[in-house]
Amino acid sequence: MTDTAPKAPVVDIPAITALVEPEVKALGLELVRIAMFGGKSDPTLQIMAERPDTRQIGLTECEALSRRLSEIFDEQDPIEDAYRLEVSSPGIDRPLTRRKDYQDWKGFSARIRLSAPLDGRKQFDGEIIGIDDADNVILDCPKVGQKILPFSAIERSKLLLTDALIAATQPLDSEGADQIVREG
């Protein structure tokens, strides 16, 4: 059976990053992730950013970054097809995309998916021990013990929502919460 679902446009993520990163830094933020997802009928370019000191971002900062990026993308036109721009915080069950994330979130539970199987499996859930000098993420997995996962082999990774994570992650404030509109 072939997958006939329309795919999101293929984009040059390094070229997009080169446009986005200076704007993110100009606002005192750090870039967490750039991703393109959705089908051909509703492609979305997602930009995740955060304040380095709090690992969060407020609604006002998301709006400011979105405006700056919209202007640049309108001028540079880095994506041929129509798409939607989404600027957001990484959220509580955030993706782990940078080496420093594995140090910053050590002691918390994560799900890591590898691009190729290791010991017969591609997905590992466990507590983050950290990242070593050889660029390996160390994860303590229930039932299988410690796993050493090469950072370069990670396809995607995210924190798992646990009581410990909820207790450790407090929102900065509720600014803009009354402006949230649910679609659908």
Curated annotation (Swiss-Prot):
Cellular compartments per GO CC: cytosol
Keyword Cytoplasm: yes
Pfam family, one: DUF150_C
Main location group: cytoplasm
One Gene Ontology term from the biological process aspect of the record: ribosomal small subunit assembly
PANTHER family registered for this protein in UniProt: RIBOSOME MATURATION FACTOR RIMP (PTHR33867:SF1)
Purpose: Required for maturation of 30S ribosomal subunits.
Protein name according to UniProt: Ribosome maturation factor RimP
Taxonomic placement: Bacteria, Pseudomonadati, Pseudomonadota, Alphaproteobacteria, Sphingomonadales
